[in-house]
C-alpha cells in the first residue's frame, strides 16, 4: 500500500497545473442556415484534444493555453461545409458568430454510409467519438462508455453489454452493418471480457438500442449497439502515442484527397508493471500480454460510391486463478483472432442507396483449466445486401438480405460431465465440428409526419437446423417540441445462439418486448425515464438433466436518470428498478439479476486550464445463485447436489471510482496525463461462489479490489 500511495502522490503532483501557463477562452455561436447548430464539433486542427461541442443554442467555449498558436479553428457539422479560421496570437478573437454554409453534395455523400440505418430515430442513446473519449468512466472504451447509463444492468465488471436485464449473449454489437460476436478481449470461460476490441479513435457514431433492437439487423433478442466507423477526417496528419502502467500504443491518421483517409493503430499490453503495483487488488491475476493492430480505410471510388475497410488482429494470452464447482486452480488462455469488414455503398440519387457488407472472422483459442484442455478453431463469414428507397422526403423503405455461415472445430480433453472440472475427475478426448448456415431477409419502412415518426418492419430467418421464424416490430417517436421526446416500441424477436463451453450446439432464443422512453432536455439539463417489459424463451442448462432446455423468463424495469451541467461541473444520477424471474420447476422463481433497486451517480469537474476530475459510484444488490448443498458419488466421481433454484444471494455490490486527467501544452505538442483509482473503498465485492473438494464449504471469489492505473497520451 505504501508503494501505491507514493505512486498516487507522485502522479498527483505531476498533474498539478503550472502557474506559468496563461490561457484564453474563445466563445462563440454556430448557426446552420438560420437555426442554431446543436452538437457541432469545434476543435483545433493540429490539437484535436482541444475541442468542444455546441449546446442546443449553438454556443461553445474553447479554452486555449499560451504557446499553442498558431493553429486553425475547425467547425464541422453534417450536411454543411467545414468552417476554417486561422488563429494567431495577433488575431485571436474573444467571441465569434459562425454561419455554416449548406453543402448538398457533401450531405449526399455522407448519407451513403452514415444514414444507412433507417431506424436511427428510435435509438435511446447516441454517442460520438468525443463523448466516448470524454466519459470519465469509459476509459476510452466504446462499450464501457455505456456502463453508467440507466439501461446498463451488468452483473459483472465486464465490457460485455448487458442491456435492460438481458444477458450479454443476447445483445449484439454491430460494426458498419456487420455483427461482431464476443467483442471483448481477455475473455474467460463464461464469455466475459475486460475490454472491448474497438479503439475510440475510429468510432464515428454509436447508437444504442437497449431493447427492441431494429430489425435491419438480426439475431438479437436483447439489444443492439450499432457502431459506425469514422467517415470524415479534418485536414492534415494526426499522430498519437500513449504509454501507461500496462500498455504502450500508437495511432496515426492521414487524408488521401478530399474524400479518402487512413486510420491505423497498434497496442502492446503487459502485466509486468501493472500487477506488482496492484498485487493486493488483483490476487487472482497471474499475468497477461496482448498485441493488437487495426486499420480503417475509407475511400471514394467514384461520385456516389464509397468503400470502407476495417481490419483488426489480436494475439493475447492471460493466466489467472479461478474457482469452479469444487476446484480452484490456474486457468491459461491464448487467443489469436482476425476479422475484416468491407463495406461498399453506392447512391444514385437522394432517393436510392445500396450497401454491400461482407465480413470474415477467424479465431484460434487454447484454454487450460483443471480437467479441461480445449482447442477451438472458429470461422464465420457474413454478407448482406441492402437497398433503401425514399418514396418521398418523408417516406422511405429499406429491403435487405443477409447470409451468415458459422463453423466451430473442437479438439481436446473434456470432463465427462460439465461440473467434473477437478484435474482428478474423469475426462476424455473429444473432437467435433459444429456448423450452421442461415439466411435472413427484412423489410423496414419509416414515415415522418412533422413531429411524429413511425417505423416498422418484419424479418424472416431460414436455416436447415431450425424451422423458419418471423420477427416483427413497430416504433413511434414523437417530439412535440425541441425539449421533449417520446419513443414507444414493441416487437417479437428470434435469434440463434452460438455454441458455448456448456453447450456445443446452436440453440434458439425468442423475445417479445415493449418499451416506452421519455427524455426532456432544456439548457444544461436532461431528464430521462423509461418503462419496459420482456418475455423471453432462452436455452437453459439443467443441472440435474445435464442438457439444454428452453425456459421462460420475464423482465420488467423502470429507469429514471438526470444530468445537469453548470459552469465547469457536470452531475449525473440514475435509478433502475429491475424485476427478473424464471419459470422453472413449474413456477416463477427469481432470476440471478432480480436486483430490485440499483443506482449510479457521477460528478465531474472539467477545467482545461487546471485539471479534470470525475468521481462515480455504482450500487446494485448481489446476484442470486443456486447453492450446492452436498455431493453423491457416481462410481468414483463426485456429483454435486443442487439446492433450491437461486435461493441464495451474494453480498451487494458497491464501487466508488476516481479519474483525473490534466492537459498540458509543450510547444506544438499536446500532452494528456491521466490517473484512475478503482474501488477506492477497497471493498470485497463478490464475483461468484465455488466449493472445497467435498462440496462441504462454499467460498466466495472477490472481484478486483483497489486498483491504480496511470498513463500519458502525446498528440503531435
What is the predicted function of each stretch?
Residues 31-35, 41-45, 76-80, 90-135, ...:
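Short, acidic, small-residue-rich periplasmic hinge/interaction motif at the N-terminus
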Residues 48-61:
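Short, acidic Ser/Thr/Gly-rich low-complexity loop/linker segments typical of extracellular
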Residues 98, 195-236:
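A beta-strand signature from Gram-negative outer-membrane beta-barrel systems
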Residues 117-171, 177-213:
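Periplasmic N-terminal accessory/gating domains of Gram-negative outer-membrane beta-barrel systems
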Residues 271-274, 284-290, 305-382:
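Flexible loop and strand-edge segments within Gram-negative outer membrane beta-barrel domains
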Residues 357-361, 479, 508-556, 563-571, ...:
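Membrane-embedded beta-barrel scaffold of Gram-negative outer-membrane proteins
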Residues 448-452, 533-535, 549-629:
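Gram-negative outer-membrane beta-barrel transporters
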Residues 619-635, 662-716:
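C-terminal beta-signal and adjacent terminal beta-strands/loops
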